[in-house]
Every structure is written in structure tokens, then in C-alpha cells.
């Protein structure tokens, strides 16, 4: 029997292999959620790391400052999904020999600016030689309560903190050269080159959300992950498609639903809220400067469907996946 290669397995099978190798852990959250949590003398110490690789995560149009910014935002977004404010961050950077020193400084500046944007600092790190640029960020924070992926119950309201399809359309514009309307271009490109994390919204939602995940791998995949972890299904009654993404799809003969459901690189939060907490949660998010968009409901039937033109259609469990996408 031939050994399976990483390129054949894909990122999610690699994660499954890691979980199998490590086994069950004693921490409150098992491996596979958005963050790790350990008991540090009665304090919930929250840890997060995520990696950015030039060949898969950095479009040619992305400037060094934006690379550093994105590397931090990717991590903050997962902390936001758990309702945790980062306290500090460190960077580990692999740098090719022909990378310019000035660009390196700009990258570090971008990472530092992003950290300060979300209320913490980069306090150290490591550098090494590498064949291509690799930036790994690790964040730490503390929390009394973590919003898991596994808390959704039938009847809970499914909601997001924003509209979808912008980053997916933006990537097609940048990488494939598909045309965008002049008035829409910034709305499409900005989420790709300078994404934002919904930290204020995540902190506001923490007392109310029963389950939460960030949407960096796509809306459909995020909903399926919540369904799998919580043992429920979902009925998506309203797919939150950004108007600029819908126009881009129309102009380029693309499916707006595919852009919204199956794209990646979007950093919205996908949450479930018990019905009795909906008004308070929506008010808290609004007071934090954000918005909470109701998109569906958790169901006892363990499948994910969307209502499209008055009929239910299956939502496939797919999204962005390293090695396979």
C-alpha cells in the first residue's frame, strides 16, 4: 500500500492525523477548535497560532506591510470567534535570502500596527532562513468563558457579523484578472489585502453566543463545522451576499451563491444565539459598532440546507483547504 502524501490528503486530513497522534487532551477545548485553552493556576490561558505562506496566502499585489497586517488579523479573527481579547503576540518568520531588509521592516511594521489596532503588542519572536516567506503568529490571552463550536442547540438562531462574497470576488479580480466595476473595486480588494477581524463584535457576543467560528475557510464550511461539533443541522434562510459581490458575479457570469458560500479569506464571525438572547446580542453588537445578520436556524435534522428561490438545496461541506484548493 502506497503512503498517502500531504498533497493527496489535504489540510483537514492532516489535522485529523495530528489529533489521532496526540489523542484526547485534558484541556476544556479539544484540538480542532479555533483556539487552545489551558488552566494556568485558575486562569483560562488562551493560545492561538496560524501561519501565512507566501505561495498560498500572499497575492502578488500584496505589499510587505499588508503581509504583516494579514498574518496578525488571521489569528485575531479566531480569538474573536471565541470571545477572547489577545494580550500579546509573537512572530516566527522564515525569510528567503533575497528578501529586502526594507521590506522585512515594513512587514514587521504591518504586524505591529495590526496588533495595536486590536489592543495588544508584538512582544518578540524568531527569524530563520527559508526558501520562501513564511510568517507564523502566536497569540495569548485570558478568558473566564470560551464560546465553543459545540454549543448550538436546535432552535438557536444562526447569524453572521457581515456580508459574504467580497474576498472571493476580490481574489478572482486580482488573481484571474476578472473585471470589476470601478466603484466596487475597493470594496472587493480591501478585504483581501487588508482584512479586518471582528474582535469588538466577538467580545460583545461572548455572553450570548452558544457557538461560534470564524469564516476564513468559507461560510458553508464554517456552518458545517458548527453543525458537526454541535450535533445539529442548519437551515439557511437568508444568504448574506454583499451587493458588490453580486454585481461582480453578474458581470462575470459567476454564481453569487458560490462566491458567498464557498469562498475563503473572509473574516466574519458565524454564531448561534438562543432565541431568548437574540435582542440583547444584537443590541450589544450594535453598541460595539457592528451588526448582527440573522441568516437561519439550527435544526434537529443533521444536514445543512439553504432556501434558494423558495426551495431547499443542500449546502455542500466545502471551502478553502490547503493542498487541495
State each model region's role.
Residues 1-325:
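Helix-biased detector of long, well-ordered alpha-helical tracts
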